[in-house]
């Protein structure tokens, strides 16, 4: 039987965006057993995957050695799916190759030397590609703006919403709990996510606390913590670190609003997770966020803290004055991003390439 190889080693970090993408795509694909081909997963912990998915998939044990050219995987699969633009693991031979592009933010980030290295790596991926999928229209447009894209089939396939069912027990309480109403955001603590602008904004929102979830071990996190101390906000800004789904759902369910002032996104799953709870969503008006947020989310055009606070206050007033409409719109929009639909579209692309 024909085989489709999914380069899915990012499953090893479920807290990362790529890890989430890999896991939820594969989980959704499990609902569509294939007669025409087998799907092979490349993963470090194959036993956990076998326990969850059984013989729905085939499995290959990931080895970091395969990142290096002499040790590349030599099996000639009928299709190789590279699940993101940053992966260093490539097939040894020239075989049918599907590339999924989440973003090309690397053209604006990192040192000049690193930018050139990543551009070279990405150009090689483009030249390998038999087809390309993008997770948003913005990701496609941005790729075309910075690179010569080969004349191959291209598809925009949106990610799904990772939260479909709300499963927070009534008696559950996380260990970190603000004493009054709060705003919530989640993501890596990095310049790109721009969490410090939220701390600055709090100076003009004395009625709110702020909960920030995500990997907070970076140098940016240290700067943010210093800013919190500078303003005397230790009892107003709460950093949870990485959190599991239950805690994330709790904070989304109980926050007053979800705030996401990111500088750059290829898609933006956290906002649609917040929408599932009918929460007002405040986003940067840039990159993919207006595309994903839609017409009834609220947007910041700049990061002046007083302006951001004013936009939040006026947005909250609009939301509260027409709460039923906004809650219904948000939950409907969240449900429109469905991993089963996403998986079905990828499987159709596979069929077209093998």
Residue ranges and their predicted role:
Residues 1-354:
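Carbohydrate transferase catalytic cores enriched for Leloir-type hexosyltransferases
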């Amino acid at each position: 039987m024909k085989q489709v190889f999914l380069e899915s080693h990012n499953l090893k970090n479920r807290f990362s965006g790529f890890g989430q993408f890999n896991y939820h795509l594969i989980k959704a694909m499990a609902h569509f057993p294939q007669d025409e081909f087998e799907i092979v997963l490349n993963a470090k912990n194959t036993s956990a995957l076998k326990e969850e998915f059984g013989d729905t998939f085939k499995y290959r044990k990931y080895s970091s050695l395969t990142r290096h050219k002499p040790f590349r995987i030599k099996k000639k699969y009928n299709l190789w799916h590279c699940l993101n633009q940053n992966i260093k693991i490539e097939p040894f031979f020239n075989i049918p190759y599907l590339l999924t592009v989440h973003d090309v933010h690397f053209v604006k980030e990192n040192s000049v030397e690193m930018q050139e290295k990543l551009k070279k790596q990405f150009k090689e991926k483009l030249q390998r590609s038999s087809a390309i999928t993008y997770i948003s229209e913005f990701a496609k447009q941005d790729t075309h703006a910075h690179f010569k894209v080969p004349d191959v089939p291209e598809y925009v396939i949106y990610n799904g919403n990772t939260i479909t069912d709300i499963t927070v027990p009534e008696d559950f309480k996380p260990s970190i709990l603000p004493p009054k109403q709060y705003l919530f955001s989640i993501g890596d603590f990095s310049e790109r996510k721009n969490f410090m602008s939220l701390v600055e904004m709090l100076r003009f929102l004395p009625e709110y606390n702020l909960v920030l979830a995500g990997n907070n071990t970076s140098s940016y996190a240290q700067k943010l913590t210093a800013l919190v101390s500078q303003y005397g906000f230790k009892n107003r800004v709460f950093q949870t670190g990485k959190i599991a789904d239950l805690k994330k759902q709790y904070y989304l369910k109980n926050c007053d609003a979800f705030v996401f002032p990111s500088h750059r996104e290829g898609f933006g799953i956290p906002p649609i997770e917040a929408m599932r709870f009918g929460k007002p969503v405040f986003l940067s008006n840039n990159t993919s966020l207006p595309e994903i947020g839609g017409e009834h989310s609220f947007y910041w055009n700049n990061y002046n803290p007083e302006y951001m606070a004013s936009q939040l206050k006026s947005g909250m007033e609009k939301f509260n004055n027409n709460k039923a409409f906004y809650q219904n719109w948000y939950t409907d929009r969240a449900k429109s991003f469905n991993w089963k639909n996403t998986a079905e579209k990828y499987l159709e692309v596979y069929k077209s390439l093998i």
